[in-house]
């Protein structure tokens, strides 16, 4: 197949490559997972037609990511992207608010838009378009005993270890914070509208409704809210 024909007919070739910022090459690894995923109709997947140069085996996957269009073994190298796509859909569905200082760095490269979040006065915030990133939630277990006593008198979010099917994130030991993916989204959005600063809120469990959305069960001073 000639490249012009491949370019016109291939979903994988026609995907625009993300323009990585030259001054910060690792920004995608630290802020948001980036992966190009393609899909195909069921009848095309049954034929192994994913719009690549070569046909692929019959797969149960609905999304894949092409790593190499051709190898020395005359094969098309690919990996499954189902977990990645489901994770991003869950994050977008929960509409995670974005810390303003993080958003300034990554905002030019975001595709889907949501409201930003900042604890500062709204009048002092710079005007920026909305975006989406990880939430920063302090972990109670990461503090010392004296800090735990001090924090017990103020409002904080304690995330319990619950089974989450799709979670991205990594620890930041220097700041005693954890950058959450889906779990951070759930904790952040579930406390929307709660303004009291005298209570402690704890995520006890997770439920899933008929549409597949995750609903956290939050308690306030041992009383369900």
UniProtKB/Swiss-Prot annotation:
Transit peptide, start-end: 1-84
The keyword Cell division appears for this protein: no
Subcellular location: Mitochondrion
Keyword Acyltransferase among UniProt keywords: no
GO molecular function, one term: structural constituent of ribosome
A GO CC term assigned to this protein in UniProt: mitochondrial small ribosomal subunit
Signal peptide: none
Gene knockout outcome: Severely decreases cytochrome c oxidase activity. Increases degradation of cytochrome b cob1 protein, and decreases synthesis of cytochrome c oxidase subunit cox3. Cytochromes b and c1 appear absent from cell. Abolishes growth on the non-fermentable carbon source galactose.
Disulfide bonds: none
Pfam families xref list: Mit_ribos_Mrp51
Membrane-spanning intervals of the chain: none
GO terms (BP aspect): meiotic cell cycle; mitochondrial translational initiation
The entry's keywords: Meiosis, Mitochondrion, Ribonucleoprotein, Ribosomal protein, Transit peptide
Record's function text: Component of the mitochondrial ribosome (mitoribosome), a dedicated translation machinery responsible for the synthesis of mitochondrial genome-encoded proteins, including at least some of the essential transmembrane subunits of the mitochondrial respiratory chain. The mitoribosomes are attached to the mitochondrial inner membrane and translation products are cotranslationally integrated into the membrane. Functionally interacts with the 5'-UTR of mitochondrial mRNAs. Specifically plays a role in the translation of cob1/cytochrome b and cox3. Has a role in meiosis.
Family (UniProt): Belongs to the bacterial ribosomal protein bS1 family.
Subunit annotation: Component of the mitochondrial small ribosomal subunit (mt-SSU). Mature yeast 74S mitochondrial ribosomes consist of a small (37S) and a large (54S) subunit. The 37S small subunit contains a 15S ribosomal RNA (15S mt-rRNA) and at least 32 different proteins. The 54S large subunit contains a 21S rRNA (21S mt-rRNA) and at least 45 different proteins. This subunit is mutually exclusive with mrp51/small ribosomal subunit protein bS1m.
Name this polypeptide is given: Small ribosomal subunit protein L51-b
Organism expressing this protein natively: Schizosaccharomyces pombe (strain 972 / ATCC 24843) (Fission yeast)
